[in-house]
Amino acid sequence: MIEVFLFGIVLGLIPVTLAGLFVTAYLQYRRGDQSDL
């Protein structure tokens, strides 16, 4: 049952990782769009 447990963890981490990357890219885009240094 350890394989099922690890599979559940991976399925739970994938959306969180994608959401984190999306938020980071969005914040960098907003920061670059607001201040033109």
Swiss-Prot record:
GO annotations of cellular component type: chloroplast thylakoid membrane; cytochrome b6f complex
InterPro entries: Cyt_6/f_cplx_su5 (IPR003683), Cyt_6/f_cplx_su5_sf (IPR036099)
Alphabetized GO MF terms: electron transporter, transferring electrons within cytochrome b6/f complex of photosystem II activity
Transmembrane segments: 5-25
Quaternary structure and interacting proteins, as annotated: The 4 large subunits of the cytochrome b6-f complex are cytochrome b6, subunit IV (17 kDa polypeptide, PetD), cytochrome f and the Rieske protein, while the 4 small subunits are PetG, PetL, PetM and PetN. The complex functions as a dimer.
Function: Component of the cytochrome b6-f complex, which mediates electron transfer between photosystem II (PSII) and photosystem I (PSI), cyclic electron flow around PSI, and state transitions. PetG is required for either the stability or assembly of the cytochrome b6-f complex.
UniProt record similarity statement: Belongs to the PetG family.
The protein, known as: Cytochrome b6-f complex subunit 5
Species whose genome carries this gene: Daucus carota
Organism lineage: Eukaryota, Viridiplantae, Streptophyta, Embryophyta, Tracheophyta
